[in-house]
């Protein structure tokens, strides 16, 4: 997969390890790339929100990881 940032790669790793059935469905329907780009975009927006609100970037990235990247719903 090209063009993925760390959040996109983390989402892919999360799906591979915890939700292979969701990963398979996304692949079968040709939606995996879109899903990963959307997840990384949402995570980036969340980090920006938190940093703007005064949180340090490493902490904000950890929150985005929990809230966006490790979410089980699609």
Where do the PLM segments sit?
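C-terminal alpha-helical interaction appendages
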Residues: 1-74
């Amino acid at each position: 997969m090209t063009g993925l940032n760390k959040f996109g790669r983390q989402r892919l790793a999360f799906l591979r390890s915890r939700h292979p059935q969701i990963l398979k469905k996304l692949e079968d329907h040709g939606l995996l790339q879109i899903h990963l780009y959307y997840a990384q975009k949402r995570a980036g927006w969340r980090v920006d929100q938190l940093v703007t609100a005064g949180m340090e970037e490493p902490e904000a990235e950890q929150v985005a990881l929990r809230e966006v990247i490790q979410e089980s719903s699609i």
